[in-house]
Regions:
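Peripheral peptide segments
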Residues: 67-70, 113-115, 162-163, 167, ...
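Extended assembly-interface/linker segments at domain junctions
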Residues: 75-164
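Short, charged, amphipathic alpha-helical segments
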Residues: 196-207
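Amphipathic alpha-helical coiled-coil segments
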Residues: 176-179, 183-186, 206-216
Length: 216
């Protein structure tokens, strides 16, 4: 699985309780940790020292956490809680019944200037047999390695041939997502509308939204 260099291996088990005990976590989220997660392993530490590359300006380390699940689904709030508690970028590998799925958040430093991070969006692969999940370490510094991993996992969701930055690609993807949501909502509303003049107005608005989506 993954095929990362031996120099990056860490292989330590983390008690899942560390992510919710003595923290301000809702009873619902605590129950998700208990019910959905079986084990958490810290598999790799991707860093300048373990990869023999240059440090990054925004990314110092990428931790690779294997999360073994009781069933092949996990509430995204769990990943956000773990990301919130770890002051580094994290690559999650979810495993269940011989299959794996990679998740990674687009993680930025919080505007407050503290060491805290905020995750704007998660990207993930499809579920696949464990031996088929392969990610490559590409880049001459940690910032480039992180960008490469996000783009590999996001696949077609993030544009790769325009020369835009990762931040710009993520923002473009978020705009697409919002437009698609608006279009779906307006289509549903138009189907329920009885008045012809209102249907025509909505159809004109739909065309505008679809044109905006096409140019992104």
């Amino acid at each position: 699985m993954l095929g990362f260099p031996v120099s990056t291996e860490y292989n330590k088990r983390i008690p899942k309780q560390k992510f919710y005990e003595n923290l301000d976590v809702s009873p619902t989220l605590r129950r998700v940790f208990v019910d959905q997660i079986r084990l958490v392993y810290w598999r790799n530490k991707l860093a300048a020292s373990t990869l023999n590359i240059a440090a990054g300006e925004a990314v110092t380390e990428i931790e690779v956490f294997e999360v073994r699940l009781n069933e092949p689904k996990l509430d995204e709030a769990v990943l956000k809680q773990i990301d919130k508690e770890i002051p580094y970028h994290i690559l999650f590998i979810l495993t269940c019944d011989g299959k794996s799925q990679a998740w990674i958040g687009y993680k930025e430093a919080a505007a407050s200037g503290s060491s805290a991070f905020k995750v704007n969006r998660y990207y993930h692969t499809d579920w696949m047999p464990e031996d088929e999940l392969q990610l490559h370490i590409d880049g001459l510094n940690m910032d480039a390695v992180y960008e490469s991993l996000v783009r590999q996992i996001a696949g077609d969701k993030l544009q790769t041939d325009s020369g835009e930055s990762l931040k710009e690609s993520v923002e473009r993807d978020e705009k697409k997502k919002q437009l698609e949501k608006q279009i779906a909502a307006l289509e549903n509303k138009m189907r329920r509308e009885k008045q012809l003049n209102r249907q025509m107005e909505m159809n004109a608005e739909l065309k505008k939204l679809r044109r905006s989506l096409e140019v992104l």
